[in-house]
């Protein structure tokens, strides 16, 4: 193996990364620094400290990144109304750039010459982590054990852990459960019965949301206040970004909002089925489009929609730190200067229904849009010339004998 003196490992404390920790120590004979990120995954992160200490790790980083995650990554993404392939709200994808950033920061702080992660060679995360790392520290060495070792099943990982006395909690028999990933934006489920695209997901799989059938029979109303495209208050109460998302997750989950079962196209070429719970994000997307509907110029709104697919693809495929994503972000953020106001929503049994929107920056003019007497605010006779000019090219083509069918 190449000389490695110190490596920073993205460490969850679970089976995979605990095995990786021991494997790095034995294979590279190097010092390992562990980094555990609290992104609001809903699990205690402190046990990772005890596990790392038990395995001889001397430098242990456990960072609360919830506010930075939502403020600097989730909110900017939602300003673009970002959706991948029409459905996926990119809950896993958007967390990876922050983890990569912090891995590199810790490597610089500790003098480490390598970083390591637990992403497999089949998935998107290996690309996301490593593109981010190379963008931020071009000369860094990246160690991806799943692309090097022969521990290619959960059973082999468990056997390795037992052989090397790695502290791992065992639940029941040796059986592959769902592969899950969680943060403050979502929780994902892959593998197991989901690998058969015809098999319905099991109800007890879901952890954050009630089934819409079991959600309350009474609707919940919410008012979201926007400033420059970001939510700053719920029902008039100002909140930090992370608190906004956590609160929307709770309320949305209670109302059966945010479940998704999709087959997506991975960057590496394969199709993959995943189930997702994104209650807060689902609410945020609907509300943001509602406030933009009255505050954005038509052509700006349409251009944003055209650019969104590219922006979503950049995030999904790991190009958050690329110059093209940064360029698009500047355009998106410039469009949000007038995206201010309040959106009222009704949440009911899995549905997010917009019931009102208002803004001092609204471009909606009731005097012009009214079906009643507009007192001359809009001259309907002007429409005749507008229509004729827009039809001119088609009229010319028809006069030249061009056939349409």
From Swiss-Prot:
Binding site for L-citrulline: 88, 93, 124, 128, 179, 188, 264, 276
Annotated positions binding L-aspartate: 120, 124-125
GO molecular function, one term: ATP binding
Keyword Zinc found: no
Keywords annotated in UniProt: Amino-acid biosynthesis, Arginine biosynthesis, ATP-binding, Cytoplasm, Ligase, Nucleotide-binding
GO biological process, one term: urea cycle
Major location (coarse): cytoplasm
Biological or metabolic pathway of the protein: Amino-acid biosynthesis; L-arginine biosynthesis; L-arginine from L-ornithine and carbamoyl phosphate: step 2/3
A Pfam family assignment: Arginosuc_syn_C
Domain of life (superkingdom): Bacteria
Keyword presence, Amino-acid biosynthesis: yes
Subcellular location: Cytoplasm
Any single Gene Ontology cellular-component annotation: cytoplasm
Enzyme Commission (EC) number: 6.3.4.5
The reaction(s) this protein catalyses: L-citrulline + L-aspartate + ATP = 2-(N(omega)-L-arginino)succinate + AMP + diphosphate + H(+)
Binding site for ATP: 10-18, 37, 118
Family that this chain belongs to: Belongs to the argininosuccinate synthase family. Type 1 subfamily.
Subunit annotation: Homotetramer.
Stored NCBIfam families: argG, PRK00509.1
UniProt name for this protein: Argininosuccinate synthase
């Amino acid at each position: 193996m190449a000389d490695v003196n110190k490596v920073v490992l993205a460490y969850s404390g679970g089976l995979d990364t605990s095995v990786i920790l021991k494997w790095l120590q034995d294979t590279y004979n190097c010092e390992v620094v562990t980094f555990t990120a609290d992104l609001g995954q809903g699990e205690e992160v402190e046990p990772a400290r005890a596990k790392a200490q038990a395995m001889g790790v001397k430098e242990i980083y456990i960072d609360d990144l919830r506010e930075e995650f939502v403020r600097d990554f989730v909110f900017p993404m939602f300003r673009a109304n970002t959706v991948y392939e029409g459905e996926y709200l990119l809950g896993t994808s958007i967390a990876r750039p922050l983890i990569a950033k912090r891995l590199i920061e810790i490597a610089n702080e500790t003098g480490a010459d390598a970083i390591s992660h637990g992403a497999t060679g089949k998935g998107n995360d290996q690309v996301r982590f490593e593109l981010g790392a190379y963008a931020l520290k071009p000369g860094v060495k990246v160690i991806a054990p799943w692309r090097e070792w022969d521990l290619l099943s959960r059973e082999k990982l468990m056997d390795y852990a037992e052989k090397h006395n790695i502290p791992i909690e065992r639940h029941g028999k040796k059986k592959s459960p769902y592969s899950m990933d969680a943060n403050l934006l979502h929780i994902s489920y892959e593998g197991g019965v989901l690998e058969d695209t015809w098999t319905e997901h099991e109800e007890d799989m879901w952890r954050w949301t009630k089934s819409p059938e079991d959600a309350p029979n009474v609707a919940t109303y919410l008012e979201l206040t926007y400033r420059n495209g970001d939510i700053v208050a719920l029902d008039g109460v100002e909140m930090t970004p992370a608190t906004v998302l956590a609160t929307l997750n709770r309320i949305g989950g209670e109302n059966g909002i945010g479940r998704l079962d999709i087959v997506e196209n991975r960057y590496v070429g394969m199709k993959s089925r995943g189930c997702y719970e994104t209650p807060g994000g689902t609410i945020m997307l609907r509300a943001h489009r509602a406030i933009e509907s009255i505050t954005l110029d038509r052509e700006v709104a349409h251009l944003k929609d055209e650019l969104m697919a590219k922006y979503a693809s950049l995030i999904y495929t790991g190009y958050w730190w690329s110059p093209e994503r940064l360029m698009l972000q500047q355009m998106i953020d410039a469009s949000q200067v007038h995206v201010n106001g309040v959106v009222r929503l009704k949440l009911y049994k899995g549905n997010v229904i917009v019931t009102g929107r208002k803004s001092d920056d609204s471009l909606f003019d009731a005097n012009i849009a009214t079906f009643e007497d507009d007192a001359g605010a809009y001259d309907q006779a002007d429409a005749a010339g507008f229509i004729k000019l827009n039809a001119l090219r088609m009229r010319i083509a028809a006069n030249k004998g061009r056939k349409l069918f």
